[in-house]
Amino acid sequence: MFGGGGMNPRKMQQMMEQMGIDVDELDATEVVISLDDGTEVVFSDPDVTKMDARGQETYQVLGDPVERDAADAIEAAPADDSDDTDDDDAIPQGDVDIVVQRASVPEDEAREALEAADGDLAAAIDHVDE
């Protein structure tokens, strides 16, 4: 039935096109899945496939996952922020990017929230979500 065991890849591609399914390989260097319990599942150098079936996008991630605590990942970030900041007192650009991504806000709003929270990522995200 399914699985395409022994099926010609070209024939499989034609069938998928007829059904309105578009498949693309993505060049991902890392995939991070954040779980509700505060852990992250991290895939380094994964094979990522994006399938678009009539507007419904599905991503398939293949690789060797590693679980880590999200708080540990933030602390383990590289200490060399020389390119990320304008001066010693500025908020690192990486922190701003995290708030922008997690809270879906503009960069200037994320930076203001981080400054108001004295650089605390969680507090800044909570602040912009209010």
From Swiss-Prot:
Gene3D superfamilies: DNA helicase RuvA subunit, C-terminal domain (1.10.8.10), Nascent polypeptide-associated complex domain (2.20.70.30). Belongs to the NAC-alpha family. It comes from Halobacterium salinarum (strain ATCC 700922 / JCM 11081 / NRC-1). Homodimer. Interacts with the ribosome. Binds ribosomal RNA. Residues 65-91 are annotated as: Disordered. The keyword Hydrolase does not apply. Residues 6-74 form the NAC-A/B domain. NCBIfam families: archaeal-type nascent polypeptide-associated complex protein (TIGR00264). This is Nascent polypeptide-associated complex protein. It comes from the Archaea.
